A protein has these predicted regions:
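Key DNA-contact positions within bacterial/archaeal DNA-binding proteins
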Residues: 43, 92-93, 108
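Short hydrophobic/aromatic patch on the recognition helix
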Residues: 45-49, 94-95, 99
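An amphipathic alpha-helical interaction segment
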Residues: 1-19, 36, 44
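Terminal helix-turn-helix DNA-binding modules in bacterial transcription factors
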Residues: 19, 23, 28-32, 51-91, ...
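Helix-turn-helix
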Residues: 33-42, 46, 88
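Conserved phosphate-binding and hydrolysis motifs of nucleotide-dependent enzymes
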Residues: 88, 100, 104-107
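Short amphipathic alpha-helical segment with a characteristic S/N-K-E followed by hydrophobic residues
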Residues: 45, 56-57, 61, 106-107
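Intrinsic disorder/low-complexity segments in short proteins, especially the signal peptide
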Residues: 34-36, 78, 100
Length: 130
């Protein structure tokens, strides 16, 4: 059984790390970078993700990116390529593969099901990056 101080410390690390990911998901983030920023070792942060979040850093980052991508695709103002870039993917094909793995469908099919009238209904609008 872990000591309460250890649990509190790991919870704090996890919360700090997830806050950074939630804000900077489109950046080129790495576990080492986040560990430095929360003043922790790579291994301690891995443990925090595993024990507190029941996930890994990479899984969390991907989930945040995919959730944001789904939101953007639902707005219909951006192409799939633009969404890919806005959530941190340089290659749209890699984005599409990750999106399909996460959501069980392609970005285009997701958009068609979520957007009234389909992907070509209505005017195109520009969105500012968050």
């Amino acid at each position: 059984m872990q000591r309460p101080a250890t649990i509190r410390h790991r919870t704090s690390l996890f919360e700090e790390a997830t806050s950074i990911v939630e804000i900077e998901f489109a950046s080129d983030l790495s576990l080492d970078d986040i560990a430095r920023r929360v003043a922790s070792s790579r291994r301690q942060l891995q443990r925090a993700y595993a024990e507190i979040g029941n996930t890994t850093f990479r899984e969390h980052l991907t989930a945040v990116r995919m959730d944001r991508a789904a939101e953007m695709l639902g707005m219909r103002g951006l192409t799939v390529r633009e969404v890919a870039h806005r959530v941190g993917y340089r290659q749209p094909a890699q984005f599409a593969k990750a999106f399909r793995r996460h959501h069980g469908t392609s970005p285009s099919a997701y958009r068609s099901r979520r957007t009234p009238g389909g992907p070509d209904d209505g005017p195109r609008v520009a969105f500012e990056a968050a």
